[in-house]
Design a protein with these regions (language model features):
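Juxtamembrane/interface motifs at transmembrane-helix termini
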Residues: 67-72, 243, 257-262
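Conserved small/polar residues in nucleotide/adenosyl-binding loops
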Residues: 264-266
Length: 266
């Protein structure tokens, strides 16, 4: 009897962050194949690490940082820029009569997240996200992203020159000639990563994010409907029928109105 857990199934084995949140410099977290629990008091960095995972293994267009906080109706105040900059303190500026933030990394800099996966049967891949900011970068749309999917185990240490030189795609291809995928946007990269990991449906990623970040799962029936049951094709047919009926009803009303107007003059 083998002690290997789910051989052939890719599982996260290592999380790396570089200049992410208050984790300054390089930090590496080894993840047990049997399962991993992140716990600690408020402000210890739990959500920071989970959010790091979701920047790569996340659902494009539906991402929320610090979802556990926003779930309770609060605004998390976290986004890609605050994580890269290392926001750590809010202060009231008496002179400006405004709230200002303190950052660990205010100037031009780069951040990185790395996820290493192993199938425990010899297969290994690494997914990397490099994020470059200029001194003037203040919004997420201004962050220059580079997503890399590579065979084997690759460290963010190997990406330092890429990060320092604005994460050029040509430089990345030259440094890593065996690239599996390279993209500027999460959506196509996520599709390539899911294919490699054997995840057929994007809904599985949404469910992963939900279970990772939720303080409570709430209504189990609703959870099943939203994340585990595909929407039947009949829903689309019903929507189309309703839309066509509305158009037909409008056209009929127009004809009736025109006919009534013509009868007035008879």
């Amino acid at each position: 009897m083998t002690s290997t857990i789910a051989p052939g199934q890719y599982r996260l084995t290592t999380l790396q962050v570089y200049n992410w949140g208050t984790f300054n410099g390089l930090h590496t977290v080894d993840v047990a194949r049997a399962g991993f629990l992140i716990f600690g008091p408020s402000g210890s960095g739990k959500s920071t690490l989970i959010d790091a995972v979701s920047t790569i293994l996340g659902s494009p267009g539906r991402h929320r940082f610090n979802a556990a906080a926003t779930e309770s109706g609060k605004k998390s105040g976290r986004d890609l820029v605050t994580y890269c900059r290392g926001a750590w303190q809010k202060e009231h500026d008496a002179e400006l009569d405004d709230v200002t933030r303190s950052f660990l990394r205010p100037g031009p800099m780069w951040s990185g997240v790395g996820l290493h996966f192993s199938d425990d049967d010899g297969g290994e891949i690494t997914a990397l996200r490099i994020m470059c900011l200029t001194a003037n970068t203040t919004t997420q749309s201004e962050v220059k992203n580079l997503f890399l999917l590579l065979p084997g185990k690759v460290s963010l240490v190997d990406c330092e020159e890429l990060g320092k030189h604005s994460a050029g795609q040509a430089d990345a291809k030259k440094q890593f000639p065996d690239l599996i995928a390279i993209n500027r946007n999460l959506s196509p990269f996520s599709a390539a990563l899911r294919k490699r990991l054997g995840i057929a449906d994007e809904k599985a990623i949404e469910l992963l994010q939900r279970t990772q970040s939720a303080k409570t799962l709430g209504d189990l029936n609703q959870l099943m409907r939203d994340f585990m049951l595909p929407e039947p094709a009949t829903f689309k047919i019903a929507d189309d029928a309703a839309e066509n009926f509305t158009e037909l009803k409008t056209a009929h009303a127009t004809v009736v109105t025109a006919r009534n107007l013509s009868l007035i003059h008879i």
